[in-house]
Design a protein with these regions (language model features):
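Short beta-strand element of the alpha/beta-hydrolase
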Residues: 32-40
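The serine-hydrolase catalytic nucleophile loop
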Residues: 41-53, 265
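Conserved alpha/beta-hydrolase
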Residues: 57-74
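Conserved acidic catalytic loop of the alpha/beta-hydrolase fold
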Residues: 86-104
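Conserved hydrolase catalytic core segment
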Residues: 102-146
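Short beta-strand/loop motif that positions the catalytic acidic residue
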Residues: 248, 254-256
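Catalytic active-site module of serine/aspartate enzymes centered on a nucleophile-bearing elbow/loop
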Residues: 277-309
Length: 309
């Protein structure tokens, strides 16, 4: 378990700063810059990013940002001043300036897709293209569809179990849970939270048996604290970039699984907004495409990116 909790990152970890916050990133490969923005917010950055970097290192300089609150940048204080969309976007721009890239291609996974789209709206002159992998919706209007879809995928017994487990771990704050799961993995609150998340993650797969594959790494590496802040910001500010996206002409790949729990309305809206986009759909596949249908996922991804460097 300690091996799972103490992640080893690549040898090329570098740092930069946004105000007084130090942030980290990794580089691999040679060629045009491809920035990889992972999900969450708060997800451990290495999977599937390392596999993607290995498959594209001959064509791109792959730049993996450890987003604030995740990976080696996990130390960032979690509050409304540090966890907001604008700060995440500023991090990307400061990283681009640090590296000196005039233009970048952005690959966004889930939440990372939201950042990729929003960054492109703010800095269109610096973006050569987008790859959106199961990207989050570009508008608050579809934000809660995810939760509704997940609810319908759970059995009554699963819902009962989640309610029971939540009563146990909700006695701790998110910050207390995050500290406790590393200090005392067998604490009752941690065990309850872990079992709760195991049920939650299953709804994100087409083949539920595959949810267990990287769950240990995901659970102990994931910092769940930033999520409520972003959910709150999106809904309270009525965050929506759909009109701005329609002004972009850059090439875009929209790739998603047919059974993604975000719902196809999310990806239809992306297609409506991004006029120069290509849509690819993987059948019998949920949100975690690289686990549900890895061969098809990497085939589509590498084929598109090696043709469009």
């Amino acid at each position: 378990m300690l091996l799972v909790m103490n992640c080893c990152y690549g040898q090329s970890v570098k740092s930069f700063s946004n105000a007084d916050i130090q942030l980290f990133y990794e580089e691999k490969g040679k060629g045009p810059a491809l920035y990889i923005l992972t999900g969450g917010p708060g997800a451990p950055p290495q999977h599937p990013s390392y596999e993607i970097m290995d498959s594209l290192k001959a064509t791109y300089t792959c730049v993996l940002l450890h987003q604030r609150g995740a990976g080696k940048s996990r130390h960032v204080p979690i509050n409304e001043k540090t966890i907001n969309i604008a700060s995440y976007l500023k991090d990307i721009e400061l990283l681009r300036q640090k590296r000196g890239d005039k233009q970048i291609m952005l690959l966004g996974i889930s939440w990372g897709g939201l950042l990729a789209m929003n960054y492109s709206v703010l800095y269109p002159q610096h973006v050569s293209g987008l790859v959106l992998l199961g990207a989050a919706p570009p508008s608050y209007t579809l934000w809660n569809v995810l939760f509704d879809n997940q609810y319908t995928r759970r059995s009554i017994s699963e819902l009962d179990s989640m309610n029971m487990l939540q009563k146990i771990f909700s006695q701790k704050t998110d910050a207390e849970l995050d500290s406790l799961k590393r200090a005392d993995p067998l604490a009752k609150e941690v065990v309850a939270f872990k079992n709760f998340m195991a049920i939650h993650v299953r709804a994100m797969h087409y083949d539920r048996s595959k949810a267990a594959g990287n769950f240990e790494e995901l659970f102990y590496g994931f910092n769940f604290q930033p999520i409520p802040y972003i959910d709150k910001e999106v809904m309270e500010t009525r965050w929506d970039i759909t009109s701005a996206l329609k002004k972009l002409s850059i090439p875009v790949l929209i790739l998603y699984g047919r059974q993604d729990d975000q719902g196809e309305a999310t990806f239809f809206l992306q297609k409506q907004c991004l006029k120069n986009s290509e849509v690819r759909v993987i059948e019998k596949c949920g949100h975690i495409m690289w686990e549900d249908q890895p061969a098809e996922f990497y085939k589509i991804l590498t084929s598109y990116l090696t043709k469009n460097p």
